[in-house]
Amino acid sequence: MNIREETKQMKLASPLLAATAMEKRNEALACIREALNAHKEEIFEANRKDLALARENHVAPAVVKRLTFNEAKLSDVTAELTSLISLPDPIGKVTLDRELDEGLRLTRVTCPIGVIGVIFEARPDALVQISSLCLKSGNCSILKGGKETTYTNRILFSLIHEAAVKAGLPEKCLLQAEQHNEIDELLECHDSVDLLIPRGSNAFVQYIMNHTSIPVLGHADGVCHMYVDKDYDIKKAIPLIIDGKTQYTATCNAVETVLVHRDIAADFLPKLADALREAGVTIRGSEEVSRLIPVEIIPEGESWHKEYLDLILAIKLVDGVDEAISHTNTYGSHHTDCIITENDETARRFMTLVDSAGVYQNASTRFADGFRYGFGAEVGISTSKIHARGPVGLEGLVSYKYKLLGHGQIVGDYASGKKKFHFRDL
């Protein structure tokens, strides 16, 4: 496949998709949902092939978990499609309406970004989420999944593309890239691809950023922190940590490090350790922590910036909220971090000074998700401060354009003083 030629064709199809009515795009999503349910046994069979190959190749259990596409995952993605259909159209929203002068009206209106290339990791359900979000927001998308789920991705893409075209969307609204060398070709398509969204390891995301002039949106990893303040409620703290660590370990919003105020450590840590061990979690910690509970000691000099994606949790003691903030900003990934406290003033300080896309008080980091935010789904979680930040849903996949409606006005009249602007918001 010639990626350059294909993306040029997608660029031509992009305005056609952007101009389709929301009803038509919603119809496509409904057709996709129907197709996934109708062909679920074929999808599961393809996924079993991928899982068998993964085990033959000694892929880590945490990764195998991410590769799985079963009845539960199908239920999740179809629920996300239903939610997405119910959301308002992100295209055509007027965010500014201003009369510059009599008969000269300026509006700012949301519009699709255009052609988006998404290179994602092992999770096959990501293909459904990404393609459906792009279609709803009127964006053409190029999808490159991991080689670990080749069979699953292939059938999912085939069903999604066929359903979208059947519903009346342009043939070139979706493209699947399967070969690894096509990634480098895609990075060079700066004249036809408007945005790249990489999802994967830190090294992979950095590679993408360093080898393209196309704008890149995304995050590298998820080293999420929870800080247990001295004014904590134990009835909240332990369930929050257990949920953040164990509810689904193989995601970027799972908690990896817990910081504990020294004043409560002797009382709190043994209770936390019992709960963690019961949940099957291996505890790593500083030498100071090891004097209070049994842990795997983290050697001095080893970085605290570590994404385990497994039933492993690091614990460190801190003097208070300011040290917790400093540690989180230094060793976290600016993804999602939480303070567990009943002191609202302390919480405000933490939530103001921690430089992350999501900052929570007394809530699990696992809430950092497009579906749980009511976005329908997400194409990923951005730790960038430009354009979109946090879970990127429909709003993060649109830009805007300015429309100026006039009646023959010329700038010369305003430059000479013959006419004057009166700038009135409507």
What do the PLM-derived regions correspond to, one by one?
Residues E121-D125, Q129-C140, I155, L159-E162, ...:
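ALDH superfamily catalytic-core signature
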Residues N37, E41, N181-R199, A203-Y207, ...:
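Aldehyde/semialdehyde dehydrogenase
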Residues D97-R98, L106-P112, L135, K166-P170, ...:
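Solvent-exposed alpha-helices and their adjacent loops that cap or buttress functional pockets
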Residues M1-L106, L133:
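N-terminal Rossmann-like NAD(P)+-binding subdomain of aldehyde/semialdehyde dehydrogenases
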Residues N70, D101, R105-L106, L174-V193:
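A structured beta-alpha segment of the ubiquitous adenosine-cofactor-binding alpha/beta core
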Residues D97-N139, G146-L156:
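Substrate-binding/gating loop at the entrance of the active-site cleft, primarily
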Residues E27, S326, T330-L426:
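C-terminal core of ALDH-fold dehydrogenases
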